[in-house]
């Protein structure tokens, strides 16, 4: 499980883990609710009311947990493919996990389901990926502008707000059970603790197909 602030490098780390070990990746940000959902949380940003996409209420935690449980139990699951620029799902994709493989689940709200996955017995480990917060600010802004996720002024204001709030956000992830570390350290720890295909881990929260 890879949690962490927006722009911290979760997706890049997940891609490296997939390339190195073949572990399937579940993008938890694809479980955002649609922009037309009347229950979406809102916030004031410079006198303008906008959807608060940084509130866990904008995300479908129950659907994410079900997908991960199905993937571990059956070796396959269907997940949405979310278009952030349109604030809507653009389709679906099927993900498969071979026996003995870890599953890398990554997203800004990943920490919200640590407890549920541990209770289900499918949590291998949970990490809060982080950099110095102004490094994260710069990486996030460059990415969001390049992908045209929202209007530039909205992205700048949101980025500054997230940077100010980052210490509190990281502390919350730690309270929910995530261990904070840089991407290289997380990769090293996962490499040395990944389950063998020939034996089941003794960790009570791990199965051979566990969510990393």
Cite the ranges covered by each PLM segment.
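ATP-dependent NMP and nucleoside kinases share a basic, alpha-helical "lid"
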Residues: 90-149
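Conserved lysine of the Walker
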Residues: 10
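Hydrophobic anchor at the beta1->P-loop junction of P-loop NTPases
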Residues: 2
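Conserved nucleotide-sensing/catalytic segment adjacent to the nucleotide-binding pocket
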Residues: 24-33, 38-86
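The conserved Walker
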Residues: 6
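NTP-dependent small-molecule kinase module
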Residues: 98-99, 142, 161-212
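Conserved beta-strand scaffold positions in the cores of enzyme catalytic domains, especially
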Residues: 23-27, 126-128, 180-181
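Hydrophobic positions on the alpha1 helix immediately C-terminal to the Walker A/P-loop
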Residues: 13, 17
């Amino acid at each position: 499980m890879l949690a962490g602030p927006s722009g911290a490098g979760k997706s890049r780390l997940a891609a490296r883990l997939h390339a190195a070990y073949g572990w399937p990746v579940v993008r938890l940000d694809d479980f955002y609710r649609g922009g037309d959902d009347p229950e979406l949380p809102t916030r004031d940003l410079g006198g303008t009311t906008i959807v608060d996409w940084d509130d866990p209420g904008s995300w479908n935690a129950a659907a994410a947990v079900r997908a991960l449980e199905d993937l571990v139990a059956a070796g396959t699951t269907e997940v949405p493919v979310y278009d952030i620029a349109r604030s809507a799902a653009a389709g679906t994709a099927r993900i498969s996990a071979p026996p003995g493989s870890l599953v890398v689940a990554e997203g800004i709200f990943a920490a919200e389901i640590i407890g549920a996955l541990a209770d289900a017995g499918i949590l291998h480990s949970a990490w809060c990926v982080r950099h110095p917060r102004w490094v994260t600010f710069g990486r996030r802004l460059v990415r969001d502008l390049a992908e045209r996720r929202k209007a530039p002024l909205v992205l700048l204001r949101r980025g500054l707000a997230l940077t100010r709030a980052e210490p509190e956000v990281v502390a919350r992830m730690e309270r929910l059970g995530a261990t904070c570390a840089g991407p290289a350290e997380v990769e090293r720890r996962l490499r040395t603790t990944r389950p063998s295909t020939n034996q089941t881990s003794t960790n009570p929260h791990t199965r051979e197909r566990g969510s990393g």
